[in-house]
Amino acid sequence: MRRVSVLCLALLPLLGTAPAHAGSGTASATVFAPNPVATLQDESLTDQKDADYPALQKAYRTVTLTHLDGSGYLHGDYAWVDTSTGPLATAPFTYHRDDDRFEQVMAYYWATQAQLYLQELGFTNVNNEPQQMKIGQYGVDNSYYNGDHSHDVLRFGKGGVDDAEDAEVILHEYGHAIQDSQVPGFGTTADSGAIGEGFGDYWAQAVSTRYAPTPDEPCIADWDSTSYTPGPVHCLRRTDGTKVYPRDLVGEVHADGEIWSSALNGMRNALGATKADTAIVKAQFSFTVDITMPAAARVTIATVQSLYGSKAASAATAAFHARGLA
């Protein structure tokens, strides 16, 4: 979930080659939606070394995996899952968290949902590919997007709550793939890197809310963060903060990204989810790899103006102004 890493562009060992479009098979599966803490509203839940203990049972959901290629593996139109920790998951995809293959199912389902939401918003050619994902990266408790354009991969770590057990960690990383699809190499400076982290958090909120709404939507990665936050409420980060640009910049892209995510969330509250999400994604086509937050705010406001008119643009301006960006 990029707690400490920056965008990694190193060349890494290649996974199996994924076709451009694999198929449209379906299968029943068991997942968290989005995670046990958010679903059950229980901040006392902890990892307990991957134990599938009784308090977690009501957090599981049965879903339908779509766009599978019929191979029996988690390979499909929009997601292509590999692992460094044991066998590949095969049907039936009804694992629980005490089996590492559960995380593979989570990755496939939520990456597919992220792409389907993009298409629902009208974006049919943004990261529209079998997004490669590898679970259990080196046993390290960190996840990240590797943006090597010959072979871009989302990699999910282990330790504490394994990262791919939390849908919002998966969706955050998918957010980086979205931006890299729109603006190759995006995030080369402090500000643009913070925009990347902020959008990743916002995208996690947007997609998890679309498919599995919970009461505290701005709290990102409630489950994964139980392993490294003191509580009483566990959040990796929030999208409803009060940080202001440039006063509250600290020079760390994840922390500074809360300025951007909170501006986007303010716009969402003003315009509604569909209008805000459409404008936010569309605006990113006009970003540069090194754009500043104020410049990105101006581009986003102009996009709102072009899509929805002056009243909506004024509401978007107010959301960015509250964060010092307009």
Predicted regions mapped to residue ranges:
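Hydrophobic core
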Residues: L9-T17
